[in-house]
Amino acid sequence: MGFPAIDQEKIYRNSMEATVAFLERYHADHYMVFNLRGRHAYDPSYFHNRVMTFEMDDHHPPRLELMAPFCRAVHDYLAADEQNVVAVHCKAGKGRTGVMICAYLVYINFYCSPRQNMDYYSIVRTVNNKGVTIPSQRRYVYYFSHLRKRNLNYMPLRCELIGVYFERPPRLNGLYFEFSFVFCFNYIFIFFFSFFLSHMELFHKF
């Protein structure tokens, strides 16, 4: 579903009031909400504190280490009572939500292949059969399937950044170019720097 909006977003998204009313009417005491916009949190008391949060950036794939815990949480809740349902949302309720729902379909072996699971999601979620369309997000569904089929657990490794290389720097009109770099790890700011290059310096360096 789309993000349950509280302020101006209610004009073009699901309102919090309408979302709560729907869940209370059809699934009272038997629903859990999964928020994939962790930094856009809301008061969980709207949903009687039945909210779990997983942070994912818009238009990005999830971190692999989040996919299995999400699937386990969904599966445990659904298995606890046959009346239980889960409501998963990001912003529009399509890309990030689709990745994690497809991961869960992989988790329960709903279809044999990641492609079949993503095709199924596209059919039941959208009117134009365009569900999970961003290549990196689709790729992570395949990654998760690979881990599941081989009973592997993903463990994040320590990485060392030793350089940044521009293979094709931008060619813009103007005398100077500004390059900026922002480094973050797990949404924690690490380092930032920027510098200017003249058109001639850029030509000689690259």
How should these model regions be labeled?
Residues 1-86, 108-119, 124-131, 163, ...:
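Cysteine-based protein phosphatase catalytic domain of the PTP/DSP
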Residues 38-39, 93, 141:
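Short glycine-rich anion-binding loops that position phosphate/pyrophosphate groups of nucleotides
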Residues 83-103:
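A phosphate-binding catalytic loop at a beta-strand-loop-alpha-helix junction
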Residues 99-103, 117, 129, 133-136:
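Long all-alpha helical scaffold domains
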Residues 102, 119-122, 142-143:
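Generic alpha-helical structural context detector
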Residues 106-107, 146:
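Short glycine/serine- and small hydrophobic-enriched flexible loop segments
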Residues 124-159:
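Catalytic cores of secreted or luminal carbohydrate-active enzymes
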